[in-house]
Amino acid sequence: MKTKVGFNRLNRKSSHRKALLKNMVISLFKHEKITSTKAKLSEVKRFAEKLITRAKIDSVHNRREVSKFIHDKFILNKLFTKISPIFKERKGGYVRVIKLGRRYGDAAEMAILELVDKTLEEK
């Protein structure tokens, strides 16, 4: 009997899926906005929310836990010093998915994933 899985497999092997999600989360924190298919972005949103919640308390333990997922030291430092202080008072909902419509080639649902507070615009 088939049972429901708690996440979307995205038609990939587990190692490919993990690498895809890690790279997309790093791109989100680097550029503060990414565009992709809605299915991928809804999975990336889950991981990004967990990482931002973990980064709100800056401790050695939390840095090590987040660094298991984010291997880029520059992005890790940006998450803990610039992104997470913006969301100190917010309990959740740090990231939003905005639907764009369908892609021309294969009619896949496209969307934008962005951080909610846009105070990081000064680069």
From Swiss-Prot:
Gene Ontology biological process: translation
Protein's UniProt name: Large ribosomal subunit protein bL17
Any matching Pfam family: Ribosomal_L17
Gene giving rise to this polypeptide: rplQ
Chain ranges passing through the membrane: none
Record-stated family: Belongs to the bacterial ribosomal protein bL17 family.
Subunit structure, as described in the record: Part of the 50S ribosomal subunit. Contacts protein L32.
Recorded GO MF terms: structural constituent of ribosome
Key words, A-Z: Ribonucleoprotein, Ribosomal protein
InterPro entries assigned: Ribosomal_bL17 (IPR000456), Ribosomal_bL17_sf (IPR036373)
Domain of life: Bacteria
Organism (species): Borrelia hermsii (strain HS1 / DAH)
CC annotations in GO: cytosolic large ribosomal subunit
Organism phylogeny: Bacteria, Pseudomonadati, Spirochaetota, Spirochaetia, Spirochaetales
